């Protein structure tokens, strides 16, 4: 299994995958994704084994010991075959010098049994890979109730401070205030 960097010519096709793989309200607009790649705020790569099988978009500012997994998906034809776990191991190895942070749907906010079960399944998937839910944090990100998960811990910073430092370069202060609400308690 290998990775290859996403190049500028692939931004539109990548975004087509993102529209298929994520709910509309979890997607940044295309211009924002493109801008963040162009400004080197985002790092993106495909997981490949003779054919692209999935992708990840990461925010990893050089001056921080954190990285945010913004988007992570396995293409539909490769799901439920163990590739997601393998791809996540690649991400963990690639960013082994950092604490990785991600958001997952909050199971307690699910409105149906099906969405609850799906949210629980995703949280358990990340827990098997070594992530844990930060229990003292609740988040509403782009209107979605999320849990914040990390594969490490920093006693000196709150989840809100960590997420602020990761999202601010990508969104700017105005958008951060509009779309991100993280409560540490």
Each language-model region and where it sits:
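A conserved beta-strand-loop-helix scaffold within acyl/acetyltransferase catalytic domains
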Residues: 23-73
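A short, internal acetyl-CoA/4′-phosphopantetheine-binding micro-motif in the GNAT/acyltransferase core
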Residues: 72-79, 106-108
């Amino acid at each position: 299994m290998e990775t290859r960097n996403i190049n500028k010519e692939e931004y539109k096709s990548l975004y087509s995958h993102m529209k298929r793989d994520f709910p509309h309200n979890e997607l940044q607009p295309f211009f924002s994704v493109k801008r963040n790649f162009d400004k080197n705020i985002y790092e993106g790569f495909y997981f490949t084994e003779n054919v692209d099988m999935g992708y990840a978009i990461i925010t990893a500012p050089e001056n921080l010991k954190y990285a945010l997994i913004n988007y992570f998906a396995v293409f539909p034809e490769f799901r439920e075959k163990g590739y997601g776990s393998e791809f996540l191991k690649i991400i963990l190895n690639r960013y082994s010098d950092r604490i990785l942070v991600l958001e997952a749907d909050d199971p307690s906010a699910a409105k149906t049994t099906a969405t609850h079960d799906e949210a629980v399944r995703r949280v358990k998937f990340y827990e098997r890979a070594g992530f844990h839910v930060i229990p003292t944090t609740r988040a509403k990100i782009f209107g979605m109730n999320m849990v914040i998960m990390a594969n490490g811990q920093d006693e000196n910073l709150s989840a809100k401070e960590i997420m602020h430092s990761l999202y601010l370069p990508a969104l700017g202060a105005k958008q951060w205030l509009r779309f991100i609400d993280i409560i540490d308690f």
